[in-house]
Regions:
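Short amphipathic alpha-helical coupling elements at transmembrane boundaries
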Residues: 5-13, 82, 86
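Short, membrane-interfacial amphipathic segments enriched in basic
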Residues: 1-7, 147, 187-188
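Generic structural signal for small/hydrophobic residues in well-ordered secondary structure
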Residues: 10, 72, 88-90, 156, ...
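Secretory targeting signals
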Residues: 5, 18-71, 95-160, 172-179, ...
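Membrane-interface capping segments at transmembrane-helix boundaries
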Residues: 229-238
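Transmembrane helix boundary and interhelical loop/hinge segments in multi-pass membrane proteins
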Residues: 47, 68-87, 91-92
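Extracellular/periplasmic helix-loop junction at the C-terminal end of a transmembrane helix
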Residues: 179-196
Length: 238
């Protein structure tokens, strides 16, 4: 079967699963809400107004991870994957279509999230907020980071074949482990996927990565996870 019909079928699956629509809605709401709360705190002479405006992505990316995880985990319940592969025997093509079907809505919602968060942040911070040039970089970086984290989770879920296992690893990692490693060794932490991608959300940076190189590192993590997921789907029984 050609790629486009497979992609269309995977997009239909996403539109018809309420949990996935809820996860995408949570990306926007959680990111904007936590960013508004962070922006409302006192910020006299804030050295990093851009990150204050986009602070909520630290929590919004959890919803993005839940989206990517659930989209793939649904295939491993009730024999759904066997039916899918019966219709699309080319497993790498199917998994590529699944990844694209996750990336497209994640990017669209990410761009919406970036725009809403920027407008909220500038409205709350006022004159102390980021410039429009910084804000545009932050909005695009926000969209790319959310998309890449959703894809990273999707690839890991394909390897583990369990949404619960994936979330049990990634959520504590994002909320606890990443910060602990960051306190112990900033050199290592700079190259973790969540921290590398968020460099684009800072007004200035002094580490080894810049905004776009940081996103490139995050993209490498996501690509590695997706390749591992494709290998797992191709080699293991459905």
């Amino acid at each position: 079967m050609p790629f486009v019909p497979v992609l269309r079928a995977e997009l239909i699956k996403i539109r018809t699963l309420r949990s996935l629509i809820g996860a995408l809605a949570a990306v926007v709401l959680v990111t904007a809400a936590f960013s508004a709360l962070a922006s409302a705190a006192p910020h006299e002479n804030d050295p990093d107004p851009l990150f204050s405006a986009f602070f909520g992505i630290s929590f919004g990316q959890i919803a993005a991870i839940a989206f990517g995880t659930t989209a793939v985990a649904a295939e491993f319940r009730g024999g759904a994957l066997r039916l899918t592969l019966a219709a699309t025997p080319d497993r790498p093509r199917w998994f590529a279509a699944k990844a694209a079907a996750i990336a497209l809505p994640a990017l669209a919602v990410g761009l919406l999230t970036g725009a809403v968060t920027l407008l909220v942040g500038k409205a709350v911070l006022g004159a102390e907020g980021p410039t429009w040039a910084e804000g545009l970089r932050g909005a695009v970086g926000c969209a790319l980071q959310l998309t890449l984290m959703a894809l990273f989770a999707a690839g890991l879920t394909a390897v583990l074949r369990s949404g619960v296992a994936t979330l049990s690893i990634l959520i504590p990692f994002l909320l606890i482990v990443s910060f602990v490693i960051g306190d112990m060794s900033s050199g290592i932490a700079d190259f973790l996927p969540d921290r590398a991608g968020q460099v684009a959300l800072h007004s200035s940076w002094d580490g080894p990565l810049g905004p776009w190189t940081g996103l490139a590192v995050c993209a490498l993590w996501s690509a590695a996870a997706l390749l591992a997921g494709m290998w797992s789907v191709s080699r293991r029984d459905a």
